[in-house]
Amino acid sequence: MIPGVREATAGHEPVKAELWKRIYSRVGSHWKGLILAVLLMAGAAATQPTLAVIMKPLIDGGFAGDKPQYIWSVPLAVIGLILLRGVCNFFSDYLLAWVANNVLLGIRREMFDRLLGLPDADFKRGDTGRLLNRFTIDAGNVTGYATDVITVLVRETLVVISLIAVLLYMSWLLTVIILVVMPISVWIARSFARRLRRINRETVNMNAELTRVVSEGIDGQRVIKLFDGYEAERGRFAYVNARLRRFAMRTAVADAALTPLTQVCIAVAVGAVIAVALGQANAGTLTAGAFAAFMSALAQIFDPIKRLTNLASKMQKMLVSAESVFTLVDQIPEVDEGQRTLAEPVRGKIEFRQIGHRFPEADRNTISDVSFTVEPGQTVALVGRSGSGKTTLVNMLPRFVLPTEGSILIDDVPINDVQLNSLRSHLSLVSQDVVLFDDTIAANVGYGALGKADDQRIHDALAAANLRDFVDSLPKGIHTPVGENAARLSGGQRQRLAIARALIKNAPILILDEATSALDNESERQVQSSLDRLMRGRTTLVIAHRLSTVQNADRIIVLDAGRIVEHGAHTELLAAGGLYATLYNMQFRED
């Protein structure tokens, strides 16, 4: 789950009722397919008691030899009934699968829409494995079990009711014996339901934990190899895997115990039925055909009763998964109270006024009383030790982080008054951690123009980013897939691809977040050349670790413990001999 978000309170009736309502309101929106499926299930259910009823005339008339017409009519009737049941079951199952998959489509779309609208802070705190499980496992469980519940409730209930009617018609006394057992079976099922729900919830959480451990094993495989972390990772995986096995076995024990206990109750009833039936036969009140029909109906009623008793387990799994799914759906989306749009053309003037910020769990401000102005077309660099507040401050510009004090203005308009779409459409970002999608080079570069860039614009952007020659050397050119996490590209190539994407967007304000800090000298030279082209004519905020990359900035702002301690040009700050000079000299000696 995403921390800080309250899960639904398990086991409380109002919560359960709300979950049922939310699940089946979505299923019910496909009511035409649902009604047709129910009618087909009713048709299939009607064939079972009919098969039992046939047994009476077959035994009493057909085997007695005085009804020769039964030689052909009864076998044909049996074949016809089985064929009818098969056709009805096929189309009802198809329709329910259609309903389930359409509901799943809608739920996943709803989940993903909410995911995209979550505040940036929620992703910082999130558990990726748990989040992925909601899409891949929980959503499927909700729709799959929801339609399974309908199938069992409708088809099996109709079968049981119709078979009970046959039993009553054949012998009410024998039927009473059977009906005495049913409440006992229901009580057993309900007693297991609460336990199953608790176990299922724990199993869902452990599945998410397993996903997280495996994901970290994949993402961190180089670190694991270099630091010889094999045993540590095996130990982490073994611990989670063993706990998951224990939960699975507890579920299996509960599921396995439910069926035999129910069957024992039924076996006692069958024994009593046989004893009473023999007494009625000897008294001449029950024929062999009637008893055969009764036993046929009784034999057919066991499976639907078993499925109905097992329904409790499916319901609990459905509700547990629904809690997880709707926890995401109910997340509070990113706040967008802006009513204005930035007037075109945006000049790019940025003003930070007395900005302060404190994280919810912190006991002091991470940023305090920060004020500065960036004129249109200027490049301003933010430097300082790690943790000085540089990234937090810059992330306030696209409103990924909200200041707790002060305000930020673009072209003299407070950004809180600007619609998020309008604000962010005028910003571009190139960061150290480049995010590229598992698609082609053209698709990733064209992403900056919302996919509306033609091949010529993409080629021009690649040329400006010093990447055209490399791309042209590829067999598929711009249509070459970059692979997952752009694994087929080097670090420098990924950075230049991100620069090309920013060039395509052509936003007037640019944010560079340590864009060259993870590169070697040659890659840094190529990327810096591309950045110089990108920065021309744009208002640029630069976060830099390597101070050599910001010497040409119009102004350098030095942060320490969330406060501005120095500002000026590179030569001025060196001459002042303050924190900037100290940091620069340390890096110069290291280089």
UniProtKB/Swiss-Prot annotation:
Homodimer. One of its GO terms (molecular function) is ATPase-coupled lipid transmembrane transporter activity. Coiled coil: none annotated. It holds the Pfam family ABC_membrane. It is an enzyme of class 7 (translocase). It is a multi-pass membrane protein. Residues 350-586 form the ABC transporter domain. ATP binds at residues 384-391. Its EC number is 7.5.2.6. The chain crosses the membrane at residues 34-54, 71-91, 158-178, 258-278, 285-305. In MsbA the ATP-binding domain (NBD) and the transmembrane domain (TMD) are fused. Its main location: membrane. Involved in lipopolysaccharide (LPS) biosynthesis. Translocates lipid A-core from the inner to the outer leaflet of the inner membrane. Transmembrane domains (TMD) form a pore in the inner membrane and the ATP-binding domain (NBD) is responsible for energy generation. InterPro entries: AAA+_ATPase, ABC1_TM_dom, ABC1_TM_sf, ABC_transporter-like_ATP-bd, ABC_transporter-like_CS, ABC_transpr_lipidA, P-loop_NTPase, Type_1_exporter. This is ATP-dependent lipid A-core flippase. GO terms for cellular component: plasma membrane. Residues 35-317 form the ABC transmembrane type-1 domain. The keyword Translocase applies. Belongs to the ABC transporter superfamily. Lipid exporter (TC 3.A.1.106) family.
